[in-house]
Amino acid sequence: MNASPSIIQKQYDHNKGYQRAPEPVDGQLVHHLHDRTEFHKYLGKERFYHDYLKYFQSEIDNKGWQNVLNEYLFARDERADDMLVRLFAGFLHPIIHLGFGVEFQQPAIMAEGLAQAAVHDNWMRPLFVGAEETAAKTPNQQSKTLMDLLNEAKSKPELREAAGSTSSNRIRDGLLAKQAQTMVDIVARYHVKPDEIDVKTAEMTNICAFFTGAAQRPEKDIKMDFYYMHCINCSIFFDKFMHQDWLSPENKVRLLEWKGRNAVTMYASRGSPDLLLDEIRNYKPKIPLKDPSDPWKDIIERVCRFEDDGHGSKLVRALAHGQRICKPYEDRPEFILKHDDWLQLGHMTIDSVEAPDGIHWIRSAGFDSAWKDVPDRKKAQL
């Protein structure tokens, strides 16, 4: 993002207030984590984060980070499958953290990402494992596009009803508690072949950006959904994951399938809102473009200065990246966003978070409750 040292320091100072001191480390416990039974015993318990962190730091030092990631996430054994589920928990925060480590080749950050995954829950297992088992029954079935699956999810009122039945965790306590098989049957129809990895990575990125930006209410000011935003923020790392030579083609396929299935589930969990492409294409930026030769420059500079917890800058960065990797496929119908749609989304993002109403994000865009405090949109003056 080309932020200056002074901006980085300013943003760190802005966010340091909620940083927590690490829990004390139990050296004996860290040693015992080498035993698979002991390793499993402490999973999902936040207070053991620091112990898992020290453990994974040691494992990476001894084995190399590539071998550790393959062993603990992609070995296709009980422990690795469980950790992979946890990596997608917490609305994708563990895999986002791991992604930064892989992108910038930082083993210390990778250890943090693995430790985060270890202390998250595995309640998404029925979705991911159930979808794999269902898909395996029809191995020759052609994949549906992600847009097809969003439309299918929207056509199921029972999914919206399940998601709307709780305000706590709409995936766990709504979709998976009440309509798990319906959700599994939908997402199982998305699958990836090894020779499709690049185009499917781009498609996933395109669709995540589309439903994040297009879930608007025409009578309300532009706002992005907080949960949807994580889907596109995470997508940037899949371009990196898919080009790691230490990761097998089979595991690249699996990782990408899980990400696509997670995206459809996330869309349904927020009430499957209408997706309005015209809201993107007709948007009038608050600050006109200054330099057409470098159209992202002003947006990036503004979001770097904007004081938040980093979500805005992650989103702008992911959108600019999405434009680049989707460009070769823009003539394909499953790629909804084209050309300057990405830049429009960049303007929508920075304008919405800078808005004086102080509402940076909404939560659960498909439900009226998400929009109740958002100002009404001013009508254009003729």
Spell out what each predicted region is.
Residues 1-382:
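Mature, well-folded catalytic/scaffold domains that follow N-terminal targeting or propeptide regions
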